[in-house]
C-alpha cells in the first residue's frame, strides 16, 4: 500500500511527514531543510520558484513574490502575475506540489494521498479550498485535520493515563486554542476557539510600521511606497522578532534603503524587547478571549488543565509564554517542537487511516455553529459549536408567504445573532413546492458535517415525500471543471520545471565539454595538424553560440556537443597513430628482431 503522508500547510512554513516504524518522521526538502517557506515566486524569465529559492530572491523580485497565501484561502482573492490570475488554491497547490515532489525523491516512491492540516477555526469554505489545493497538486486529500488536534496527537502518542490538555496554536497567520481529553488511545476534543486573522505576521507588521514611522520622521520618505524596500523591512522585522525571543534588544540595519536626491540613506534602529511588547500588547490581548471562551465551553477552570502544548513559531515570544504561565499557573510543555508538532500529528493520523496505527481514536468538533437566516435577518443555529463530528441534524422549515412554490435557505457559520455578521456558506434554492397557505408546507433540511469538517446539505418536502435537490451557489468554491483545469495547468508548470532543469543540466554539460576541449587544445594543439585544431575551434564557437540564449534548444545543443566530441576524438586518433608510427620504426631504439622466432626467457639474479 502506498504511503499516506501528513502535511502541515502553514502560513509561513510548510512541512511534510510520514510514518516509519510506527513513528512520525519529518521529510527534508530538496534544499536539505525540514521547513519549506510557504513562498511562491514567478521570475521574469518564466521560472516558478517555491520555498527557499523563492524566499532568497524576494527582495529583488518583490512584485512577483507571494507569501502568506493561506490568509486568503476560502475567499475570492486573486494574485495577478503578468496577464494571468491565480487563486489562493492554485498558489497553495504549488507549495503542496513542491512538498510532494521532494518527498517522492526522498522516499523513492510515488505519493498520491495525504492528510492536510488546517486551523481549527477554518470555515467550511476555507476547508474546501484546502481540499481543492490538494487536488490541483495531484493529491487525494483523505482527511482534513485541525492543527491543534494534530499537535495533541504528536504529544500524546506515548502518554499513559488521562489528561486534559490545552493546545495554544499561534502560527504565522492564524490563532487556535483547543482543549482535549486524552487517555488510553482516545483523543477527544471538547472545545475549540480561535481567530483566523491573528498570527506572527501581525507582530511583524507592527515592527514594520514602527520602522516606517521612524524613518518618515527622520528623513521625510515613506518606505511603504517602495515595494523592494518594504520587502527588506518585512524580512528584517521577522528576523528582529525572532532575535527578541532570546535577546533583550536587537539592531535593525538596512543600508541603502532609499535615496534623497543623490544621497543614499541607511536605516539603523535599536528595538528593545520592552518596546516590541509595547507595540504588540493588544495582539497578545487578542489571544485571551478565545482562550477564555474555550475554557468556558469545556466547563473547565485554568487550574483544571493538566498540560499546555505550544504550537507555532510565534509561541516562542516571551510575552506569549509569560501570559500563559501567569494565567494557568504552570509552565507550558517544552518537549514539543512548535514548528513540527502539527506535521508529525498529521502523519500519525495518516497512519491511523492507512492501518499502520490501530489503537488511536480521534474525536474532533466543529469550531463554529451552523445554521440559517430566518425572518428578520436573524441567525438560527442548527448545529452548535463544539459539537463532535461527524454529525447530522435536521430541522423543519416552512414558507413565509401564501402559495409560495420555492424558498431560499441561506446557510451560515458563526456565533453572531444577526445573519449578516456571520460567514455565508451558500444559498440553497428549493423549488417545486405545492402551492399552499404560508406555514403549511413542511420542508425538512438536513445539515451534515463530515470528518473533514465540511458541510453537506439535503432537503425533503414532507408533504409529497419527494426529496429535492438543493443548488449551492457559493462563488468561492471551485467547480470540478475549474479544479480539472487548474490541475492541468499545474501539470504544465511541472512539465515546464522539468524542461527548465533539463536545459540547465544540458547547458552545464556543454560548458564542461567546452572547458575540456580548450584544455585539450592547450595541451596537445601543437602536436596535431592545424586542420584538426581549426575544426575543434569551430565546433567550440558553434556550441558557445548555441548556449548563449537564456532558453536554449536542448536538441541543438546536444547535437553541437556530439559534433565537438567527435572532433575531439580526431585529436586522440591522430595522437595514437603518431605514437604507433613511432613505435613501429626499426631505425629508432633497439632491434625488434627475434632470431629464430623463439621465445627468449629472461634471466634474473637475486643478490
From Swiss-Prot:
Domain of life of the native organism: Bacteria
Name used for this protein in its record: Chaperone protein DnaK
CDD domains membership: ASKHA_NBD_HSP70_DnaK-like
Upregulation: By stress conditions e.g. heat shock.
Annotated keywords: ATP-binding, Chaperone, Nucleotide-binding, Phosphoprotein, Stress response
Biased composition (Polar residues): 577-594
Record region (Disordered): 577-607
Function noted in UniProt: Acts as a chaperone.
A Gene Ontology molecular function term of the record: ATP hydrolysis activity
HAMAP family: DnaK
Family to which this protein belongs: Belongs to the heat shock protein 70 family.
Organism: Dictyoglomus turgidum (strain DSM 6724 / Z-1310)
One GO BP: chaperone cofactor-dependent protein refolding
Phosphothreonine found at: 174
InterPro entries (alphabetical): ATPase_NBD, Chaperone_DnaK, Heat_shock_70_CS, HSP70_C_sf, HSP70_peptide-bd_sf, Hsp_70_fam
Amino acid at each position: 500500500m502506498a504511503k499516506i503522508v501528513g502535511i502541515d500547510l502553514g502560513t509561513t512554513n510548510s512541512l511534510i511527514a510520514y510514518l516509519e516504524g510506527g513513528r512520525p518522521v519529518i521529510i527534508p526538502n530538496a534544499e536539505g531543510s525540514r521547513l519549506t517557506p510557504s513562498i511562491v515566486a514567478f521570475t521574469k524569465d518564466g521560472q516558478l520558484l517555491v520555498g527557499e529559492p523563492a524566499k532568497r530572491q524576494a527582495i529583488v523580485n518583490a512584485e512577483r513574490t507571494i507569501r502568506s497565501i493561506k490568509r486568503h484561502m476560502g475567499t475570492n482573492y486573486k494574485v495577478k502575475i503578468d496577464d494571468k490570475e491565480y487563486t489562493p488554491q492554485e498558489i497553495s497547490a504549488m507549495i503542496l506540489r513542491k512538498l510532494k515532489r521532494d518527498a517522492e525523491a526522498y522516499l523513492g516512491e510515488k505519493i498520491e494521498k495525504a492528510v492536510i492540516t488546517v486551523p481549527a477555526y477554518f470555515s467550511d469554505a476555507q476547508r474546501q479550498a484546502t481540499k481543492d489545493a490538494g487536488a490541483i497538486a495531484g493529491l487525494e486529500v483523505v482527511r482534513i485535520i485541525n492543527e491543534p488536534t494534530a499537535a495533541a496527537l504528536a504529544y500524546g502518542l506515548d502518554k499513559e493515563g488521562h489528561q486534559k490538555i490545552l493546545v495554544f496554536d499561534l502560527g504565522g497567520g492564524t490563532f487556535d486554542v483547543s482543549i482535549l481529553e486524552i487517555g488510553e488511545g482516545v483523543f477527544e476534543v471538547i472545545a475549540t476557539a480561535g481567530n483566523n486573522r491573528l498570527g506572527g505576521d501581525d507582530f511583524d507588521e507592527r515592527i514594520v510600521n514602527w520602522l516606517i514611522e521612524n524613518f518618515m520622521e527622520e528623513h521625510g520618505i515613506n518606505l511603504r511606497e517602495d515595494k523592494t524596500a518594504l520587502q527588506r523591512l518585512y524580512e528584517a522585522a521577522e528576523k528582529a522578532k525572532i532575535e527578541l525571543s532570546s535577546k533583550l534588544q536587537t539592531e535593525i540595519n538596512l543600508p541603502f534603503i532609499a535615496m534623497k536626491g543623490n544621497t543614499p540613506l541607511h536605516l539603523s534602529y535599536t528595538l528593545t524587547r520592552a518596546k516590541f511588547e509595547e507595540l504588540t500588547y493588544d495582539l497578545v490581548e487578542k489571544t485571551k478571549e478565545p482562550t477564555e471562551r474555550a475554557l468556558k465551553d469545556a466547563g473547565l477552570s485554568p487550574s483544571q488543565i493538566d498540560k499546555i502544548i505550544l504550537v507555532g513559531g510565534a509561541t516562542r515570544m516571551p510575552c506569549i509564554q509569560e501570559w500563559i504561565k501567569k494565567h494557568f499557573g504552570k509552565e507550558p510543555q517544552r518537549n514539543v517542537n512548535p514548528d513540527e508538532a502539527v506535521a508529525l500529528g498529521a502523519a500519525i493520523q495518516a497512519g491511523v487511516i492507512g492501518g499502520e496505527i490501530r489503537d488511536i481514536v480521534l474525536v474532533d468538533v466543529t469550531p463554529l455553529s451552523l445554521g440559517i437566516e430566518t425572518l428578520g435577518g436573524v441567525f438560527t443555529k442548527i448545529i452548535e459549536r463544539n459539537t463532535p463530528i461527524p454529525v447530522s441534524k435536521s430541522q423543519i422549515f416552512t414558507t413565509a408567504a401564501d402559495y409560495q412554490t420555492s424558498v431560499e435557505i441561506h446557510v451560515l457559520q458563526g456565533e453572531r445573532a444577526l445573519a449578516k455578521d456571520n460567514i455565508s456558506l451558500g444559498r440553497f434554492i428549493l423549488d417545486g413546492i405545492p402551492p399552499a397557505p404560508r406555514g403549511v408546507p413542511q420542508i425538512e433540511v438536513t445539515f451534515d458535517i463530515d470528518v473533514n469538517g465540511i458541510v453537506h446539505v439535503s432537503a425533503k418536502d414532507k408533504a409529497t415525500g419527494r426529496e429535492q435537490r438543493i443548488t449551492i451557489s457559493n462563488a468561492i468554491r471551485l467547480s470540478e471543471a475549474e479544479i480539472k483545469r487548474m490541475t492541468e495547468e499545474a501539470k504544465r508548470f511541472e512539465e515546464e520545471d522539468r524542461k527548465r532543469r533539463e536545459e540547465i543540466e544540458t547547458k552545464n554539460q556543454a560548458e564542461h565539454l567546452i572547458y575540456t576541449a580548450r584544455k585539450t587544445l592547450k595541451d596537445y594543439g601543437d602536436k596535431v595538424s592545424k586542420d584538426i585544431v581549426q575544426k575543434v575551434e569551430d565546433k567550440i564557437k558553434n556550441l558557445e553560440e548555441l548556449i548563449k540564449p537564456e532558453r536554449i534548444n536542448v536538441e541543438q545543443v546536444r547535437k553541437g556537443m556530439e559534433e565537438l566530441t567527435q572532433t575531439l576524438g580526431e585529436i586522440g586518433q591522430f595522437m595514437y597513430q603518431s605514437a604507433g608510427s613511432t613505435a613501429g620504426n626499426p631505425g629508432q631504439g633497439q632491434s625488434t628482431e627475434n632470431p629464430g622466432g623463439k621465445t627468449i626467457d629472461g634471466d634474473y639474479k637475486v643478490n
